[in-house]
Amino acid sequence: CAIPLIKDCAVYRSAIIDYAINSLDTDFAKFGSLYETAGEGGTPTTSNASFYDNGKIPFVKIDDLKQKYLTENKDFITELGLQKSSAWLVPTRSILFSNGATIGEITITTYPVCTKQGILGIVPKSNIDVEFLYYFMSSTYFKKAISRIVTEGTMKTAYLKDIANILCPIPTKEKQQGIAKMPSALNSKIDYEQSLLKLFIMQKQYLLRQMFI
């Protein structure tokens, strides 16, 4: 079954990431110094059809943040919807990180996207490897730091102004790239098994529908 295998691979991957991060002997820097720009997205008014009809701009929601790389999404908005909201276009090879309600979902963009509120777009500086940043933000170290700054309210939120102050061990870019290679094989296996599981669920749903036609 794919689910236990996915869980096992995820556990091993987490252990590798944590070992690599905890073994770093390097200077610390504030998280805010690692990116060129960062910010939450926003949702265009849903009652205005001109913000959505025939839209071509990918609009990412929390359900899209399920794998290491964002390769597809379900929803789109128009250029007008982008202009009339607080959404902004997050470039390719950036990080998306959910910081509201469901906190901690993360992916790397493979094409420009905008997001709803509660999802941060993070554009790394040139001296920061996006693969390393992905794994660092997936580490127990970072998750614990996030848990300490989450505010309770109508919705749990980790605000960017607080995330920016998290101290991060940041080695040279060459070392970052070396660390990022360590869990990559397991990550590929996880993504593959998740794709198979998704296909299986779709086939099952199709067969169930056919039974009642």
Q: Model-predicted segments: where are they?
A:
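A short beta-sheet element
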Residues: 61-62, 72-138
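Face-specific signal for non-transmembrane alpha helices
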Residues: 7, 14, 184, 191, ...
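A short glycine-rich beta-alpha junction/loop motif
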Residues: 52-53, 99, 113-120, 128-131, ...
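Hydrophobic structural patches
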Residues: 6, 17-21, 179-187, 212
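Glycine- and charge-enriched low-complexity intrinsically disordered segments
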Residues: 134-143, 151-152
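Extended amphipathic alpha-helical segments enriched in small hydrophobics
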Residues: 172-200
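Non-catalytic DNA-recognition/assembly elements of restriction-modification systems
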Residues: 5-42, 67, 165, 169-173, ...
